[in-house]
Amino acid sequence: MSLYPSLEDLKVDKVIQAQTAFSANPANPAILSEASAPIPHDGNLYPRLYPELSQYMGLSLNEEEIRANVAVVSGAPLQGQLVARPSSINYMVAPVTGNDVGIRRAEIKQGIREVILCKDQDGKIGLRLKSIDNGIFVQLVQANSPASLVGLRFGDQVLQINGENCAGWSSDKAHKVLKQAFGEKITMTIRDRPFERTITMHKDSTGHVGFIFKNGKITSIVKDSSAARNGLLTEHNICEINGQNVIGLKDSQIADILSTSGTVVTITIMPAFIFEHIIKRMAPSIMKSLMDHTIPEV
C-alpha cells in the first residue's frame, strides 16, 4: 500500500498509473491523440502523456516541475510493460510534492532518540519544560542554545534525564534536575512531538493553500482548497511552517513566511487546547524574543 504526503500526490499518482497502464496495454485501441501516445523511451513522459496535470485539482504545475518529481525505474520491463513511478520521500510516493525540503525539515519521526548536550558558559541549556498528564514536554527552546543545537523542538516529550524516568515529575522537579546536572554532559531521551502532526498542501494559481488563522490558530478552512482536501482542521495552532518554528510570531510574520514559501507548504499543527496548556503562564514576549525561530538544517 502506497503512502502519499498529500491528497494531490495520491490523485496525480492514480492518473499516472492509469495512463501508464492504458498506454502499455497493446490490447487498447489506438487513439489519435497526443495524450495517449506510446510511452517514449527517453524518460520524457509528462509533456506528452499528461498535459492535463498542469492544472490538475487547481494546482499550478509546469512541465519542469513534473519532470523533476518523476523517476523512471530502470531495468527490464515486466511482461512488456514500462514501469514509471514517481520519486519517493521517506518511502512516500510524491509525484507533485517531489523531494521537498520543507517536508524533510518538518518530519515528525516515530520512535525515541537520545541527545547529549552540555551547559553554556552561563550554566544554562536554553530549555523550559512543562508537566502535562504525568509527562514532561518542551515548552521553549531558545535560539542558539545547547538545546537548539541538538535539535530539541517545542512539543518534544522528555522521557529521561541522565537515566532517570521523568514520568510523574512536576515542571519544577524537571528544572531542578537539569539545574543540578553536571554541566559537561546531560543525556536526554526524547519522543518526537507526540501531540503534533504535519499537513502538506499545495498552493493554487493565486498562491494560497486555503486556510485563515488568527493569533496563530486556524479559524477557517476555504472550501475546495488544498487545506480542505488534505484534512486541515480548525482549532489547531500552527507550530511550524516547513519545519521553521513560528510560535510567538505575529500573524503578519506568519503570513509572510507562508507567502514566500514555495508551491509546497508543510505546516505542523497541534490541537489548541493542548497548545494553550503547554504555553500557559509563558508571556508572549518571551516566546517572541527567546523561542528558536531559525530554519533547521536537513
From Swiss-Prot:
Residues that hold a 1,2-diacyl-sn-glycero-3-phospho-(1D-myo-inositol-4,5-bisphosphate) according to the record: 215, 250-251
Q: Mind telling me which Pfam families this protein's record contains?
A: PDZ
Tissue expression as described in the entry: Expressed in lung cancers, including adenocarcinoma, squamous cell carcinoma and small-cell carcinoma (at protein level). Widely expressed. Expressed in fetal kidney, liver, lung and brain. In adult highest expression in heart and placenta.
The UniProt annotation puts motif LYPX(n)L motif 2 at 45-49
Chain positions of motif LYPX(n)L motif 3? 49-53
Q: What are the N-acetylserine sites (modified residues) in this protein?
A: 2
Q: Name one GO molecular function term.
A: protein sequestering activity
GO BP term, pick one: chemical synaptic transmission
Please report the stretch or stretches of sequence annotated as the PDZ domain: 114-193, 198-273
Which stretches of sequence are listed as region Interaction with PDCD6IP? 2-60
Cell compartments where the protein resides: Cell junction, Focal adhesion; Cell junction, Adherens junction; Cell membrane; Endoplasmic reticulum membrane
Report the membrane topology from the UniProt record.
Answer: Peripheral membrane protein
What is the superkingdom listed in this entry's lineage?
Answer: Eukaryota
List of residues that carry Phosphotyrosine: 46
Q: What induces it?
A: By IFNG/IFN-gamma in melanoma cells.
Motif, LYPX(n)L motif 1: chain positions: 3-7
Role, per record: Multifunctional adapter protein involved in diverse array of functions including trafficking of transmembrane proteins, neuro and immunomodulation, exosome biogenesis, and tumorigenesis. Positively regulates TGFB1-mediated SMAD2/3 activation and TGFB1-induced epithelial-to-mesenchymal transition (EMT) and cell migration in various cell types. May increase TGFB1 signaling by enhancing cell-surface expression of TGFR1 by preventing the interaction between TGFR1 and CAV1 and subsequent CAV1-dependent internalization and degradation of TGFR1.
Q: How does it assemble?
A: Monomer and homodimer. Interacts with SDC1, SDC2, SDC3, SDC4, NRXN2, EPHA7, EPHB1, NF2 isoform 1, TGFA and IL5RA. Interacts with NFASC and PTPRJ. Interacts with SDCBP2. Interacts with PDCD6IP. Forms a complex with PDCD6IP and SDC2. Interacts (via C-terminus) with TGFBR1. Binds to FZD7; this interaction is increased by inositol trisphosphate (IP3). Interacts with SMO.
The name of this protein is: Syntenin-1
Q: Which organism is it from?
A: Homo sapiens
Q: What is the lineage of its organism?
A: Eukaryota, Metazoa, Chordata, Craniata, Vertebrata
